Amino acid sequence: MASEYEKMIAGDYYRPADPELRALAKASREKQEAFNQEVDPKKGAAIIKEWFGSTGENLYLNRQVLVDYGVNIHLGENFYANYNLTMLDICPITIGNNAMIGPNCQFLTPLHPLDP
């Protein structure tokens, strides 16, 4: 049987209150708080590399960054994001090399049931 995490990233119905998902979300909130308070770009990049599923070597993200889990986000080489990036990574988000993201961009993967 698939875990709630496996169901979630497959786009199936899942229980967000699952202990594994709650632990991932809590860890993500802690890293989010640390990143959004960090003023040193190198330390900020180190937090992102620890937080996200994978990243290239060269990346720069301005604050505020808001995500659900972080582990489902994959960034290529030479990634830049301007202010107020939101990435709701219920399902994987993959951005390739040499990407520049403007201010106030949102990558939203959740989809709530449309049929009762």
Predicted feature residues:
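Flexible, glycine/small-residue-enriched loop-and-beta-strand segment within the central core
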Residues: 65-75, 80-116
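Hydrophobic beta-strand core residues of beta-sandwich domains
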Residues: 8, 53-55, 59, 67, ...
